[in-house]
């Protein structure tokens, strides 16, 4: 789909591809198809293999591709030749020219597999007039409060929220988060790969969002 001149494609599970001003970047690519192009930037949220997939980083990267990741991914990503890996943490901000990226908190309070002390990440990315919030593997957390203002501004504000209950926030919690953040558009993620989350979870998220006056849409995997 196109959002204010930014092309957004679903890579499956929790992965997305953004194309803007002739540049491509991917977030958490996992089991991507052969149709996905090489990218200039890859953002990794944390070290679990369905988010930090070495095979997919190798598949999408080219010489000089920048890979942002938290410290727990560092040793695994050293296996990928030719990339420029940058270890980042919450609060870091990187300006790529075509996109400005900020690292934000992502953790679960209901599941110890994503503990806050791990320092794992979500990302805010601004491209043109649009701010994209990629929540990562998270529950609703207090740190999301500072994002509530984005939905009240003139800028487009698009949020990507997990809908896989038991591991991260479930559908109802994701709808509650979307209501709090008041985005221009809410897009479900973390489903359909067989790891956790189903297409029905994503469909239910969209249905419940619309019942609550929230614009939401599923994307088709490329």
What function would you assign to each model-found segment?
Residues 55-60, 76-81, 143-147, 173-177:
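A short acidic, amphipathic alpha-helical/loop segment
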Residues 24-25, 41, 158, 185:
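Short, Asp-centered acidic motifs that coordinate Mg2+ and/or phosphate
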Residues 125-184, 189-197:
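Metallo-beta-lactamase
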Residues 1-37, 87-154, 220-222:
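Core dinuclear metal-dependent hydrolase active-site scaffold
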Residues 30-76, 150-160:
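Active-site metal-binding motif and surrounding structural segment of the metallo-beta-lactamase
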Residues 81-96, 175, 179-222:
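Binuclear metal-ion centers of metallo-dependent hydrolases, dominated by the metallo-beta-lactamase
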Residues 33-34, 48-52, 74-77, 92-95, ...:
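Active-site environment of divalent metal-dependent phosphoester hydrolases
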